Amino acid sequence: MAVPKKKKSKSKRNHRHAVWKGKAALAAQKAMSLGKSVLTGKAQGFVYPIDEEEESEE
């Protein structure tokens, strides 16, 4: 006969949600930091291709 599974406690559910949200917040923070460094030109780990047209105009 089918028997319902035991219900997990709300504290376990809340803990799982907190871990997930914490990881998401950390990823968002890293993405914002990377975006800011790229926009300000302080990023050292990127190589940008320079178009020949831009060089000739300057």
Swiss-Prot record:
GO biological process entries: translation
One Gene Ontology cellular component annotation held by this UniProt entry: large ribosomal subunit
SUPFAM superfamilies referenced in this protein's UniProt entry, alphabetically: Zn-binding ribosomal proteins
Transmembrane segments: none
Presence of keyword Ribonucleoprotein: yes
Keyword Ribonucleoprotein: yes
Superkingdom of this protein's organism: Bacteria
Keyword annotations from UniProtKB, A to Z: Ribonucleoprotein, Ribosomal protein
Stored Pfam families: Ribosomal_L32p (PF01783)
Entry similarity comment: Belongs to the bacterial ribosomal protein bL32 family.
Protein name, entry field: Large ribosomal subunit protein bL32
